[in-house]
UniProtKB/Swiss-Prot annotation:
A UniProt-annotated Pfam family: SH3_2
Gene from which the chain derives: Arhgef37
Function as written in the Swiss-Prot or TrEMBL entry: May act as a guanine nucleotide exchange factor (GEF).
Name of this chain's protein: Rho guanine nucleotide exchange factor 37
One Gene Ontology CC term in the entry: cytoplasm
An annotated Gene Ontology molecular function: guanyl-nucleotide exchange factor activity
Organism: Rattus norvegicus (Rat)
Length: 676
């Protein structure tokens, strides 16, 4: 009996130590079980993701184009990160004593990568669900999708696609719970405890950041949608709330412009917006230039001289026709197709991609006005309504999203733009190589084939220079003897415009469009044949004298100089009817007369004479006698004043009053000859 009592007392004295040891062993066991659960579930999770990409996504090619990208989003990036993460988890198994510590460090190491890949997937999840609901409305398609999923993942059940798509969301939210479970079974004095605490907090922050990013993307998606609404639909959306909101914003803007309230300054956003606008301008200009290039290419391909009968049998002409036909049907056609597919279509897609950020930036300015008004009220009153607080958060979310993603967007657009330009250059080089390769057999017929490239370039420049000089000489010679070109009939209702331009600029600046002009640039004008314009400058801002700056009386812009001719006066026989228009007698508008083929007419040429005598008062002026013929060099002085004209008479030049001059017709004798 005494021995039994002694043993009982001994067992009671040892029980606290045994209980402590048993509790520690139990916590360690639970910790290892939690770690095992983390690793095993990660293996199963990664296996399911790989099934989604290989056995399911690969067999859903019957879905509309682009749907697979929305459904599975960036699942490939998630698989890549999870594979490396699982490899790190499995490597910790060989060090059981430090395994919990190593797992905590591993989560901290992968914190940023996990957030980056999962936030993209979670932000696109709602759009994927909308597609799933759309498929459910098509029984045949839904049955086919369900069969593919059940064959690959039987545990998906009737949920099918929805079951698979939600798995990544469940996984990222489960990481903090698994870490918390490991942390609870880790002694507070263990070295792994603070590391696990930081890892648990970090994964909780990851989930919070993902939720915040998803909310920002939802706000952005709301304002980046481009709706094609009719005027009636737009008017139907106007209500008292809309009018009140617009009025409040306008009032806030006017107070800022008047300096009554300060304007919120955000240099970071301003710099990003300026960069974005510059990038957008580059895309717009390149698209405009490529469009003009393709129009010119189309016009070039319409001309097919090799299909004409040149009446030159055999020889170089026949070989040229064969080469031109070959290039037209193969090389040029292939170049056009590649240009459309590799340059034009990507450029159009890039231009469309700019619309969303542009709308977002515009909406951000509206929300900024709401935010500033709410901030003022918060300072004055100390509280705001629920709607005002929501408007405040909307601006903050929108601004944070733009500031975070616009730099990356600008960088991607510039990369895309550079790739398009490089592709365009490569296409040009390929076309040149292809043409040279096809023309190699014809090069033996060229007279200068043995000349070096620098010498050939100089020879070409000299030949073109001589031809240009000869053509200029011919033109000047013909202009001296040919009668003035017949002006085109005025457009209906343009008499008043003609009167206005003539009064403002004088007759020496009035030109008429000889053929239709289609403007291609932002500063180019589109004008019909017969349009009257006034010359402002005979060159553009780059000094190019083939583009003239003109005034139509309503718009100003550039037109090709070759499609303009000086507006000439008409015969005196038409002067009498013309006086009824109220114009001065010295200027006559052309009126077309019916031609009479049976009665030959004598061509007339007009000359300018001095109507009154004029005595020069300085060396800049020229003395004239009444009836003395003169040549008008400029119908205005150096300041553009049309009241004085620069003339030449008897080899001398000087200024005379413009109203002292008049044009008189002089008949040209029959049989006038061309210059020899």
């Amino acid at each position: 009996m005494a021995d039994f009592e002694t043993d009982e007392a001994s067992s009671k004295s040892e029980s606290p130590e045994q209980e402590g040891q048993g509790s520690e062993d139990k916590s360690l066991l639970h910790q290892r079980l939690a770690i095992r659960e983390l690793i095993d579930t990660e293996v199963s999770y990664l296996h399911t993701l790989r099934l989604c990409t290989s056995d399911i996504r690969g067999h859903l090619q019957q879905l509309p184009p682009g749907d697979l990208d929305i459904l599975f989003s960036n699942i490939d990036d998630i698989i890549q990160v999870s594979s490396r993460f699982l490899h790190g988890l499995q490597e910790t198994a060989c060090k059981e004593e430090k395994q919990a510590h190593l797992i905590g460090n591993l989560f901290l190491e992968f914190q940023e990568e996990l957030e980056q890949v999962y936030k993209v997937y979670c932000a696109n999840y709602d759009q994927a669900l909308l597609l799933v609901k759309a498929y459910q409305k098509e029984p045949e398609l839904q049955k086919e999708i369900q069969g593919i999923i059940e064959a690959a993942v039987p545990q998906a059940g009737p949920s099918g696609l929805s079951f698979l798509l939600v798995i990544p969301l469940q996984r990222i939210t489960k990481y903090p719970l698994l870490l918390q479970k490991i942390l609870e079974n880790t002694p507070a004095d263990a070295s792994a405890h603070p590391v696990l605490q930081r890892a648990t907090s970090a994964l909780q922050d990851v989930n919070s950041n993902i939720n915040e990013y998803k909310m920002r993307k939802e706000v952005a998606l709301k304002y980046t949608k481009v709706e094609q609404l009719s005027l009636r639909e737009r008017l139907a959306r106007i209500n008292t709330h809309t009018l009140s909101k617009k009025t409040t914003r306008l009032s806030q803007l006017l107070k800022q412009e008047a300096g009554l309230v300060p304007r919120t300054e955000d240099k970071e956003f301003d710099d990003l917006e300026e960069r974005f606008q510059w990038v957008s301008l580059c895309v717009t200009e390149l698209k405009s230039n490529v469009a003009a290039y393709m129009d010119n290419l189309e016009a070039f391909l319409c001309f097919r001289p090799h299909e004409r009968n040149l009446d030159i049998p055999g020889g170089a002409a026949e070989q040229y026709c064969s080469l031109a036909r070959d290039l037209q049907l193969q090389a040029f056609l292939q170049f056009k197709q590649r240009l459309t597919g590799l340059v034009w279509q990507p450029l159009c897609s890039l231009a469309r991609a700019l619309v969303g950020p542009q709308n977002l930036i515009k909406k951000r300015l509206d929300k900024l006005l709401d935010f500033e008004r709410v901030e003022e009220k918060l300072l004055d009153v100390g509280s705001v309504t629920y709607e005002e607080e929501a408007a405040r958060h909307t601006y903050q979310a929108l601004n944070s999203l733009i500031v975070a993603e616009l730099p990356q967007f600008n960088h991607l657009v510039m990369q895309w733009l550079g790739q398009i330009l490089r592709t365009f250059v490569v296409l040009q080089r390929d076309l040149a190589d292809q043409v040279l390769r096809r023309a190699e057999s014809s090069m033996a017929l060229l007279p200068h084939r043995h000349v070096s490239e620098p010498d050939f370039q100089k020879l070409l420049e000299d030949t073109l220079g001589q031809s240009s000089s000869q053509l200029r000489h011919f033109r000047e010679s013909f202009e001296k003897v040919l009668p003035p070109s017949t002006s085109q009939p005025l457009l209906p209702g343009s008499e008043h415009q003609m009167q206005s331009l003539l009064t403002r600029y004088g007759p020496g600046k009035i030109y008429q469009v000889t053929s239709n002009i289609n403007g291609t640039g932002t500063l180019d004008l589109t004008l019909p044949r017969g349009q009257i314009v006034a010359l402002l400058q005979n060159k553009d801002t780059k000094g190019n004298n083939s583009r003239w700056l003109v005034d139509t009386g309503g718009h100003r812009g550039y037109v090709p100089a070759g499609k303009l001719q000086l507006y000439h006066p008409i015969n005196p026989s038409e002067k009498e009817p013309r006086r009824q228009t109220g114009m001065p007698e010295d200027y006559w508008l052309p009126t077309p007369e019916p031609t009479q083929p049976s009665v030959p007419t004598v061509p007339t040429m007009s000359q300018v004479v001095a109507v009154y005598p004029f005595v020069a008062r300085s060396t800049h002026e020229l003395s004239l006698q009444a009836g003395q013929p003169v040549t008008i060099l400029e119908a205005q002085d150096k300041k553009g004043n049309p009241e004085w004209s620069l003339v030449e008479a008897n080899g001398q030049r000087g200024y005379v009053p413009s109203n002292f001059l008049a044009r008189t017709p002089s008949p040209t004798p029959r049989g006038w000859n061309l210059p020899s």
